[in-house]
Amino acid sequence: MNTCTTIRNNWQLDEILELFNTPFNDLILRSHLTHRQFFNNNEIQLAALLNIKTGGCPENCRYCSQSAHYKTDLQKEALLDVENIKKAIQTAKNSGADRFCFAAAWRQLRDKDIEYICNIINLIKSEKLESCASLGMITLDQAKKLKNAGLDFYNHNIDTSRDFYSNVTTTRNYDDRLASLNNIYEAGINICSGGILGLGESIEDRAKMLLTLANLKEHPRSVPINRLVPIKGTPFENNIKVDNIDFIKTIAVTRILMPKSYVRLAAGRKDMSEEMQALCLFAGANSIFYGEKLLTTPNSNCDDDKNLLSKLGIKTKEPVLLNSQN
């Protein structure tokens, strides 16, 4: 097996489908060896995530409890005040997180909220943590302002393939997502972008989603892979759970396509066994969301995470990507 990996932005769909069809042991061995070329194989990034504005989103994403289009048990909440955000940042740091992400249930970032967002970025940077914002669609001018405030990453997931996208939402289109990703890139902010498995997509849709990400001008520095958490009241509440092996294979393919990216286990990890998480980490995942709540869905218990990482001999990393693409 050739273990020398070249960074590419010219992947073809048939190549990625071939990876998905590779026998499991061969695939995760290749992805593991790829991972070792670019990362400490026994190191992981812990990312905390805070919802600064909950519910009432005008988008109709069919998986989301925060959409105003569906009747879920979620209670709508206004923007958090800065003091509560400051406490959350300090709590995350004290718990061992080296990256702090914050999100708002908005269609797009509004100019009137820029100062408020920049204040949050300053609070995160004052604690010497990596910062990541997920605030919806963003213009180039807005992205430049967040870059100047010190933002390290901007999250903007593409969710699935272009072909399947209209089955997920109809209030925006795929090109809207890609335009925002380009604005983030042009502003010099590191891109965080991934997808969700379990929306009803095919293996080919997963391959096409990863193809889009891997063939961007520059690979996202962070790629969150979510497993759908079905929410009662949403159109996807009865979706079939993604097969565990299929999920692990997607992690492996992601690592092979984007060798230098942080591959993050995101939503749905609470229902994964220790053995499944261990295989995901072996296959190339090297970041997890840390904390007992992930936006509006439950996450793994912090003590359980610490225990698992200890058993695996995995240590946490120090923040290094401070407002830089290098």
From Swiss-Prot:
Which pathway is recorded for this entry? Cofactor biosynthesis; biotin biosynthesis; biotin from 7,8-diaminononanoate: step 2/2
Q: Does the keyword Acyltransferase apply?
A: no
Radical SAM core domain boundaries: 42-266
Q: Which InterPro entries match?
A: Aldolase_TIM, BATS_dom, Biotin_synth/BioAB, Biotin_synthase, Elp3/MiaA/NifB-like_rSAM, rSAM
Sites where the protein binds [2Fe-2S] cluster: C101, C132, C192, R264
Report the sequence similarity comment from the record: Belongs to the radical SAM superfamily. Biotin synthase family.
**Free-text function comment from the UniProt entry:** Catalyzes the conversion of dethiobiotin (DTB) to biotin by the insertion of a sulfur atom into dethiobiotin via a radical-based mechanism.
The record's note on quaternary structure and interaction partners says: Homodimer.
**Protein name, as recorded:** Biotin synthase
Which organism was this protein described from? Ehrlichia chaffeensis (strain ATCC CRL-10679 / Arkansas)
Gene name as annotated: bioB
